[in-house]
Amino acid sequence: MDKKELFDTVINLEEQIGSLYRQLGDLKQHIGEMIEENHHLQLENKHLRKRLDDTTQQIEKFKADKKESKTQKTEQTDIGEGYDNLARLYQEGFHICNVHYGSVRKEDCLFCLSFLNKK
């Protein structure tokens, strides 16, 4: 190998090393950007999961409250409807007390009246 070929080989190696160095720098920068993006995505994911949990808890609480109020309304409505039916039967002339239930009444019954006055 003469000096010129040796010099050309060294220049070629130097260019290859420079190219590899630039590629390594680009790769390092790209990895840094990916790590930063990953960190931001992890934070966003954490916040979204917390928000989802909070929203889910609020929805469950709302459903429970709604179910409870519906149950209370139903109980109140049922009690009111039963009372109204018994009052209607009494007005139509039937006993609603446990002593003479369903029989025709000729005059006011103290048992029936005491039952109607309960709340």
UniProtKB/Swiss-Prot annotation:
What does the entry list as the binding residues for Zn(2+)?
A: H95, C97, C109, C112
Q: Name one Pfam family in it.
A: YabA
Ordered alphabetically, the record's keywords are: Coiled coil, Cytoplasm, DNA replication, DNA replication inhibitor, Metal-binding, Phosphoprotein, Sporulation, Zinc
The coiled-coil regions, if any, are 1-62
* InterPro entries associated with the record: YabA
User: So which cofactors does this thing need?
Assistant: Zn(2+)
Annotated consequence of substituting F111 to Y/N/S/A/D: Still self interacts, still interacts with DnaA, no longer interacts with DnaN, loss of localization
Modification after translation: Phosphorylation of YabA by YabT on Thr-71 enhances the cell's commitment to sporulation, possibly by increasing Spo0A-phosphorylation in cells. The same phosphorylation event probably prevents biofilm formation.
Asked if the Swiss-Prot or TrEMBL record annotates the protein with the keyword Phosphoprotein, the reply is yes
Q: How is the cofactor bound?
A: Binds one Zn(2+) ion per subunit.
Specify the domain of life of the species encoding this protein: Bacteria
Q: Does the keyword Coiled coil apply?
A: yes
Residues bearing Phosphothreonine are T71
**Gene3D superfamilies for the chain:** Vasodilator-stimulated phosphoprotein
Task: Give the CC-aspect GO terms.
Answer: nucleoid
Q: Where in the cell is it found?
A: Cytoplasm, Nucleoid
The knockout note for this entry states: Greatly reduced growth rate, abnormal nucleoid distribution with increased replication origins per cell and increased cell length. Asynchronous and over initiation of DNA replication. DnaA is no longer tethered to the DNA replication machinery but instead to oriC, allowing it to initiate replication more often. Increased half-life of DnaA binding to oriC. Little or no effect on gene expression during exponetial growth or after replication arrest. Increased amounts of DnaA associate with oriC and other tested DnaA boxes.
Q: What Gene Ontology biological process does one annotation of this record name? A: DNA replication
Similarity comment: Belongs to the YabA family.
User: What function does this protein fulfil?
Assistant: Involved in control of chromosome replication initiation. Inhibits the cooperative binding of DnaA to the oriC region. Thus negatively regulating initiation of chromosome replication. Inhibits the ability of DnaA-ATP to form a helix on DNA; does not disassemble preformed DnaA-DNA helices in vitro. Decreases the residence time of DnaA on the chromosome at its binding sites (oriC, replication forks and (probably) promoter-binding sites). Tethers DnaA to the replication machinery via the DNA polymerase beta sliding clamp subunit (dnaN).
Q: What is known of its domains?
A: The N-terminus is probably responsible for self-association. The C-terminal domain (residues 62-119) interacts with DnaA or DnaN but not both at the same time.
Instruction: Give the record's subunit note.
Output: Homotetramer. Interacts with both DnaA and DnaN, possibly acting as a bridge between these two proteins. The N-terminus (residues 1-62) assembles as a head-to-head dimer of dimers with a single long alpha helix, and is probably responsible for tetramerization of the whole protein. The interaction sites for DnaA and DnaN overlap; thus DnaA and DnaN associate with different subunits of the YabA tetramer. Interacts with AcuB and TlpA.
Instruction: Tell me what this protein is called.
Output: Replication initiation control protein YabA
Phylogenetic lineage: Bacteria, Bacillati, Bacillota, Bacilli, Bacillales
Gene field: yabA
